[in-house]
């Protein structure tokens, strides 16, 4: 699952569902048993993978995400289509968030 971060800084998402679009995600335990950092919205009772338009937005929002103690986290870029396949296979939605954790778009893969 390890991906190279090749998204140009400041690139705008035209449509988060475009299959060739790169997005930024948080990866838990990179280089080991890595997996996407998922979150759970208790009000809507939905599990989701947060995605971001930029690495900086992801890094800033990571500070407020629910995380495991003593676990390493890394922001990485991934092709949206690859993420959508993994999210669908594991029962996760995808939420496009801003740096403050506000939901900009909900995507059912």
Language-model regions, residue ranges each:
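Conserved NAD+-utilizing ADP-ribose enzyme module
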Residues: 2-109
């Amino acid at each position: 699952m390890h991906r190279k971060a090749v998204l140009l800084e400041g690139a705008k998402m035209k449509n988060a569902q475009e299959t060739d679009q790169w997005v930024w995600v948080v990866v838990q335990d990179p280089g080991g048993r890595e997996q996407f950092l998922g979150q759970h919205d208790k009000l809507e009772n939905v599990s989701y993978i947060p995605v971001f338009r930029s690495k900086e937005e992801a890094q800033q929002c990571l500070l407020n995400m629910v995380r495991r103690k003593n676990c390493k986290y890394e922001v990485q870029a991934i092709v949206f289509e690859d993420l959508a396949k993994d999210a669908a296979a594991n029962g996760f939605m995808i939420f496009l968030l801003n740096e403050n954790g506000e939901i900009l778009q909900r995507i059912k893969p």
